[in-house]
C-alpha cells in the first residue's frame, strides 16, 4: 500500500506544489503525495509550473487548495515547508509531522 504524504506551505503555489509533483513523478509507485496551503492563492506560481515542466512534470492543471480540504483524511506523514504559526490551523491526522523551513 502506498504511503500518503501531505506537503503544506503558506500559499500552495510554490514549495508544496513542487514537492508533490516530484514525489508523485519519481516515487508514485510507493507514495501518494498531496499539497495544500494555510492561506492559498488563486493560482500556482507560473515559475513553479515552468520549472517542473523543464524536468517533465506537468502541474499546469493544479490549483492551490486550503489544508482544510484534507481535514478528514489520514496521512502517513505531513511535511511543513514554511515558517508559519500552525497553532491556528487544524491539520489532518498523521503519524508524523516534519518541518522543513
Locate the predicted segments by residue.
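N-terminal Rossmann-like NAD(P) cofactor-binding module of classical short-chain dehydrogenase/reductase
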Residues: 79
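Local beta-strand N-terminus motif with an aromatic residue
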Residues: 75-76
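Short, charged/polar "capping" segments at the starts of alpha-helices
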Residues: 41-44, 85-89
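Residues at the C-termini of beta-strands that transition into short coil/loop
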Residues: 37, 82, 99-101
Amino acid at each position: 500500500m502506498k504511503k500518503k504524504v501531505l506537503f503544506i506551505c503558506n500559499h500552495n503555489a510554490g514549495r508544496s506544489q513542487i514537492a508533490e509533483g516530484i514525489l508523485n513523478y519519481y516515487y508514485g509507485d510507493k507514495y501518494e503525495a498531496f499539497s495544500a496551503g494555510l492561506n492559498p492563492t488563486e493560482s500556482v506560481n507560473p515559475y513553479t509550473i515552468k520549472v517542473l515542466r523543464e524536468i517533465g512534470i506537468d502541474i499546469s492543471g493544479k490549483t492551490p487548495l486550503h489544508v482544510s480540504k484534507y481535514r478528514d483524511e489520514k496521512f502517513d506523514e505531513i511535511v511543513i515547508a514554511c515558517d508559519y504559526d500552525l497553532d491556528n490551523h487544524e491539520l489532518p491526522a498523521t503519524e508524523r509531522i516534519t518541518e522543513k523551513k
